[in-house]
Every structure is written in C-alpha cells, then in structure tokens.
Amino acid sequence: MAAMPYSKLSRRSFLALSAALLWALRGVASGLAPSRKIPVGLELYSVRDELQKDPQGTVRAVAKMGYQDVEFYAPYLEWSEAQAKDMRKLLDDLGIHCYSTHNDEDFFSDSKIQKARDLNKILGSRYMVLAWSDPKPTLDGWTKVAQTLNSAAEKLAPAGLKVGYHNHDTEWKAVEGKRPIEVIASNTKPSVMLQLDVGTCLEAGADPVAWIKANPGRIRSIHCKDWSPDPNVGYKTLFGEGKADWKAIFQAAENHGGVEFYLIEQEGSRYPELETARRCLEAFRSTHA
C-alpha cells in the first residue's frame, strides 16, 4: 500500500493512527498479555428492582460479592447533591468506585448538563455515557448525535469529565449504506469513549473483536453482556453461556482497545437479580483469569 501523503492526513486520522501505533507497541512490550489488572464492575440496571427498594443496601451487596466499581444509570439525576454525597461516602467506605454513569440524551442539554456534571463529580465518575439514542432514518440524524457528544465533551472537559457513547443493536444496521456506529466513531473527538455493548453487537450480527481493533484506544469500557440466538433466552443468558468469545474480546480490549474497566450487565436471567450478578462475576473471573 502506498504511503499516505502527510498533507492529506486529517488531524482525526493522524490521531487514530497514533493511537493504533501506541496500542500496538504496548501489546508487543507486554508479550500480548494484559499489563495491568482491569477492574470489573456492575451496571446497576442489572439489579434495578433491588436498587429501587434499597439503593445503599444493594450497593453494599454488590461490593461484598467482589465487584470493584458500579455504573449508575439514568435515575441518578433525580438525586440531590446531599444524596450523591451519601452515596459517594458509601462507595469510599466500601472501597469501590463509580467510573461512569449512564445518561439519557437530554441530560446533555443546557437545562440538565450542569446538574449531571455536578453529580458525576461528587460520585467520582470519569465518564458521562450517552446510554441510548432513538434510531435515526438518515445518516444526518446520526451525525447530529456525534455533534451532541462533541459539544458535551467541550462543556464537561473543564470539570475533568469525558463523554462516552453506548451502542445498541440499531447502530450496527446500515442506514443509507453505512453503519451508524461508524458515523459516530468517525465524527466524534478521540476523547469520546466508545463503550461497547457486546450482547447487542452480537445480536446485530457484528464482530466485537473487529470493532475493537478498528478503534484503538477508544473502547475504554465494555459492557460484558452475553447473548444467545435462542429467542427464548436472548440477553437473559448468563455471562459465558452465550455466543460471545470472551477470551478473544478481552485480548483485543486490553491489547488494542485501551479498556480501563469492564462492566457486567444483565437484563435478567433464570435467577433473582443479586444471584445473577454473583454468578456472572464468578464466570467472568473464571474466564478472565
């Protein structure tokens, strides 16, 4: 392949190539083995019924299982600052962290972003992740989502917060000849994390390993949710019992993706919520060991 003239290399392309080189060199230096222990947490939507009944008791139970961090989802924005401080104290007392939160699209609006920012800072979060965007019929619609993420990234940067995007299955399905997830990746700042939901990626027929390798340094968080093609099971399969090739995913994430933390997510199973969370963590540790 002929070398690309520097004059035609965009800033975004240059940064992407630089990130690829960095992670390639890191992989060589480590002998293609993980160079550090990546924490594993729980997306608290997995225990949503328990969380609604007893937020602090549920977080305590999750920490006792051995989870190292938690990801709060949209209802956290209903908290007062005092409630957020109480939760942060609990996290500190338990020795666990909140590295990210899941947010509705309007949390990034002018009317809500300040409160979301302040609560995330109290919790110690690094990333405000856009958890869902309604399917768009045109690429222009998805480009506007990318613009929203870029704008939020600029507003949150002074507070030390970054932005992320969490995929569902719809982003892998072509619109006007291109996958929306590619539009988001190519039109957002390199600082915008691409949080990979493995289960929805698999459901859409996409390859999570290929996606990680195509976006070096940007897959800083992964939702470790499995998926079964059995329509009676789907996302309710336990971690490790579905279609995902977790060893290949972990290797790609740690040698190419720049993963900083894993999050187990479960949308239900044949067991109660807390038992499901415990079983998934045990399976994760066995697979990732």
PLM segments and residue spans:
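Active-site acidic/histidine proton-transfer and metal-coordination neighborhood
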Residues: 18-20, 24, 32, 69, ...
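Mature catalytic domains of secreted/periplasmic carbohydrate-active enzymes
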Residues: 81-82, 90, 100, 161, ...
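Glycine-rich, proline-tolerant flexible connector loops at the mouths of alpha/beta enzymes
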Residues: 71-88
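Histidine-acidic metal/acid-base catalytic patches
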Residues: 5-8, 14-25, 29-41, 47-65, ...
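Active-site beta-loop-alpha junctions enriched in small/polar residues
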Residues: 45-47, 73-77, 103-106, 132-135, ...
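Short, Lys/Arg-enriched N-terminal segments with co-localized hydrophobic residues
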Residues: 1-3
